[in-house]
Amino acid sequence: WLPITKEQKVLEIGSGCGPITGVLARKAKSVTCIDLSKMRSTINAYRNRECDNVKIMVGNFQDVESSLTEKYDYITLIGVFEYSQGYIGTAQPYVEMLRRIARHLALGGRIVIAIENRLGLKYWAGCTEDHVGKYFEGLENYPDTRSVRTFSRKELSDIIDQAGAFRTTFYYPYPDYKFPMTIYSDKRLPKKGELRD
């Protein structure tokens, strides 16, 4: 649903085994993938072997950033932003991550972040936190977790504001971004009774 065109370049940070890479490659002029794992990157390369517009780099974003010579129309962080403190060793790793990737945006480019909502409905309904598998860990603001964290809408909005002058649009996939049944936005929030089942 992103309006990516064949004239645009995409940087996919945290591409993993490539579940999104092929879709991006079919829409974009080129896709540059970065992932920490050589094994996941090998799977991605095999999975998308028929896409001649995909380049895969293995390593931490900090380590491969200097090799990025292009500007990108879209930079995606799908299930990755929550791990920024492991990649960026600063006092404000999430703010710094956005500042660093913004340097690689083309004029008018967009950053796309898909991340769990720390206060999401599924956690209130009794699901364990996606990353650490503990009940209420995110709802209680991660008292026992240091390596990963997700944010409420307000917290994420504050991080984005601190990082720079970004124009933001929030979307709300239900029940989550991994397997959305419906995607809401501030222009179209759920009506009474829509969140059943």
Annotate each PLM feature.
Residues 146-164, 170:
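Short alpha-helix
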